[in-house]
Amino acid sequence: MKLDLKILDARMRDYLPKYATTGSAGLDLRACLDAPVTLKPGDTALVPTGLAIHLADPGYAALILPRSGLGHKHGIVLGNLVGLIDSDYQGELMISTWNRGQTEFALNPFERLAQLVIVPVVQARFNLVDDFAQSERGAGGFGSTGRG
């Protein structure tokens, strides 16, 4: 798939999103910062990437996801848990960053902060019904299938 990428900050030419390995599903996104940003425990920040994308095809969307190492080792996760980029969005990719850890974290300029994953999208059309055809599960939820 081809993806239109617009560089909004010239410094990002040296830090284009890329897959870390041939098996990577996510493209690394970096913090486009002039200076380090310190996040105290509980702090949030909206971090620019200096990049914009345009998927154009309504059959695709992009997800901004946290990097597992930052979350596990430092408590740095996405403030909105997952960022959804619609196919028609053309603005700058911003990363809602939250320090849910117990210590301060310094985010450095151009540090890898999140990952971008392209996913297929199916847009549903609703069919209004009075009731559903019976299924094995029915309306059971919240532990109805058992534990373990």
From Swiss-Prot:
Task: Please state what class of enzyme this protein is.
Answer: hydrolase
Entry keyword Calcium: no
Which residues does substrate bind?
67-69, 80, 84-86, 94
Q: Name one Pfam family in it.
A: dUTPase
Give a yes or no for keyword Metal-binding in this entry: yes
MF term (GO), any? magnesium ion binding
Question: What SUPFAM superfamilies does this protein's entry cite?
Answer: dUTPase-like
The UniProt record lists the EC number as 3.6.1.23
Which Gene3D superfamilies does the annotation name? 2.70.40.10
The transmembrane segments are none
Keyword annotations for this protein? Hydrolase, Magnesium, Metal-binding, Nucleotide metabolism
What pathway is it annotated to?
Pyrimidine metabolism; dUMP biosynthesis; dUMP from dCTP (dUTP route): step 2/2
Q: What are the BP-aspect GO terms?
A: dUMP biosynthetic process; dUTP catabolic process
Q: What cofactors are annotated for this protein?
A: Mg(2+)
Q: What domain of life?
A: Bacteria
- Catalyzed reaction equations: dUTP + H2O = dUMP + diphosphate + H(+)
Functional description taken from the UniProt entry:
This enzyme is involved in nucleotide metabolism: it produces dUMP, the immediate precursor of thymidine nucleotides and it decreases the intracellular concentration of dUTP so that uracil cannot be incorporated into DNA.
Q: Which family does it belong to?
A: Belongs to the dUTPase family.
Output this protein's name. Deoxyuridine 5'-triphosphate nucleotidohydrolase
Q: Which organism is it from?
A: Burkholderia mallei (strain ATCC 23344)
